[in-house]
From Swiss-Prot:
Cofactor: Zn(2+)
Binding-site residues for Zn(2+) 1, renumbered to this chain: 63, 65, 143, 213
Designated name of the protein: Ribonuclease Z
Origin superkingdom: Bacteria
Entries under SUPFAM superfamilies matching the protein: Metallo-hydrolase/oxidoreductase
EC primary class: hydrolase
Name of the gene this protein is made from: rnz
Gene Ontology MF annotations: 3'-tRNA processing endoribonuclease activity; zinc ion binding
Pfam families registered for this protein in UniProt: Lactamase_B_2
Cofactor note: Binds 2 Zn(2+) ions.
Length: 304
């Protein structure tokens, strides 16, 4: 079982190539799957990576450019053919429902499951969804059309019971949940046993930030500060910085600057322009600012 993994299905940009697939990722938190963006080829890559379709319940769309959403109709149709009956929630800017409803009416009539659209304001940093395992927040980005990234914040886990100590102090089973949540134990004689003697701290919760597509945008730094893993688009090399500015994209160096200033633990870059056959120069540029930058690739699994 994956504890908290990121699966990169595609890390190319708008123009299709034989080197990269259009953008899509799967966040796997203890076998709960959350998709970010859904470009062409997404479901084929899910097959290649042996990702279970049935465990996908939420899809987060950053913006309405085709390389981030053209894979949705096919995936939705496939889920129906696989006999899905549970609700699928699609989160994204209001335009996502306007795009998908006519497509669903034509190609996906009679689906055996419900699709619900959770429409968000991509210009604000706000809570998008939460369940027992994590909270997901929007990250306002700077692109040619309304666009947001997503911050996946794992919820704090309960402390681990030290069985030898709870047995020694004869802590009743009915009190174990309270102890896990931080309560002290009072013995029948009135002695207070501090929680720290009865439990071990759980592993600190992790956070993952996805930022694509965007121009260089320092305003996101307070939102992503200190995250365990940051995916930031790096469409262009520094020699094409003028083109990056014109198209509201980032260079690899700019992605690294954001990571450095936000003091993130690790950086992975992607969304490469089709003009580059070799991505090594992008990594080299990023490494100068943020050493150890990871060059995103299709099929890559990263532990947060």
């Amino acid at each position: 079982m994956a504890d908290f993994d990121i699966n990169i299905l595609g890390c190319g940009s708008a123009l299709p190539t034989t080197r990269h697939l259009a953008t899509s990722q799967i966040v796997d938190l203890r076998d709960k799957l959350y998709m970010i963006d859904c470009g062409e080829g997404t479901q084929v890559q899910m097959r290649r990576m042996r990702i279970k379709f049935s465990r996908l319940n939420h899809i987060f769309i950053s913006h309405l450019h085709g390389d981030h959403c053209f894979g949705l109709p096919g995936l939705i149709s496939t889920l129906g053919m696989l006999g899905r009956n549970g609700e699928l929630v699609i989160h994204g800017p209001k335009e996502i429902e306007s795009y998908m409803r006519p497509v669903l009416d034509i190609f996906c009539k009679g689906l055996p499951y419900e699709i619900r659209f959770n429409l968000i304001d991509p210009t604000t940093h706000s809570l998008v969804m939460e369940d027992r395992s994590l909270s997901v927040y929007s990250i306002p980005l700077k692109h040619r059309i309304p666009c947001c990234g997503y911050l996946f914040a794992e919820k704090a886990k309960e402390a681990h019971i030290i069985r030898e100590m709870t047995d020694f102090y004869q802590v009743p089973v009915r009190m174990m949940q309270e102890i896990k949540r931080g309560a002290d134990f009072v013995t029948p004689e009135g002695e207070v046993i501090p929680n720290a003697r009865l439990t071990r701290p759980a592993v600190a919760p992790k956070r993952y930030a996805y930022c694509s597509d965007t121009a260089f945008h320092p305003s996101i730094i307070p939102i992503i500060e200190g995250v365990d893993l940051l995916y930031h688009e790096a469409t262009f090399a520094e020699c094409d910085a003028a083109r990056a500015k014109e198209t509201f994209h980032s260079t690899a160096r700019q992605a690294a600057e954001i990571a450095y200033k936000a003091q993130v633990k690790r950086l992975v870059i992607g969304h490469y322009s089709a003009r580059y056959e070799d991505m090594a120069p992008l990594k080299k540029e990023a490494d100068k600012i943020f050493p150890g930058t990871i060059l995103g690739e299709e099929g890559m699994r990263l532990s947060v």
